[in-house]
Amino acid sequence: MADQRFYATGKRKTAVARVWLKPGSGSVTINKRTIEEYIDRETSKMVIYQPLVLTGTFGKLDVTVNVLGGGGSGQAGAIRHGISKALLEFNPEFREVLKRAGFLTRDSRVKERKKYGRRSARARFQYSKR
């Protein structure tokens, strides 16, 4: 077991993240770019680091991510979900702490479709009485 890697997929909205973990220096690579190059918002970086900080593996595992679809927030959520599931592969004892934090649950909220006869999913067209 010279090169042991732990794989998992994470999803959020329309984003899908494929995550690989391996013991290392703690570098995070997203779509062949560093996290600083790929993600602008500090809150998104914090979301991605949450499972690593919570389990005490921050700086001990190299994270490689391939993420497709969605926007910035959806991709960050998908990466967090994927990292959490990969951490379970790495160490099943993390299940309790990750489950309590809600990182293992797939957030099923997606955009509601627009309905015909309406301006958007719920909003009606503007009504003029006269």
From Swiss-Prot:
<dbReference type="InterPro" id="IPR020568">
    <property type="entry name" value="Ribosomal_Su5_D2-typ_SF"/>
</dbReference>
<dbReference type="GO" id="GO:0006412">
    <property type="term" value="P:translation"/>
</dbReference>
<dbReference type="InterPro" id="IPR014721">
    <property type="entry name" value="Ribsml_uS5_D2-typ_fold_subgr"/>
</dbReference>
<keyword id="KW-0689">Ribosomal protein</keyword>
<comment type="similarity">
    <text>Belongs to the universal ribosomal protein uS9 family.</text>
</comment>
<dbReference type="GO" id="GO:0022627">
    <property type="term" value="C:cytosolic small ribosomal subunit"/>
</dbReference>
<keyword id="KW-0687">Ribonucleoprotein</keyword>
<dbReference type="InterPro" id="IPR023035">
    <property type="entry name" value="Ribosomal_uS9_bac/plastid"/>
</dbReference>
<dbReference type="InterPro" id="IPR000754">
    <property type="entry name" value="Ribosomal_uS9"/>
</dbReference>
<dbReference type="Pfam" id="PF00380">
    <property type="entry name" value="Ribosomal_S9"/>
</dbReference>
<protein>
    <recommendedName>
        <fullName>Small ribosomal subunit protein uS9</fullName>
    </recommendedName>
</protein>
<dbReference type="GO" id="GO:0003723">
    <property type="term" value="F:RNA binding"/>
</dbReference>
<dbReference type="GO" id="GO:0003735">
    <property type="term" value="F:structural constituent of ribosome"/>
</dbReference>
<dbReference type="InterPro" id="IPR020574">
    <property type="entry name" value="Ribosomal_uS9_CS"/>
</dbReference>
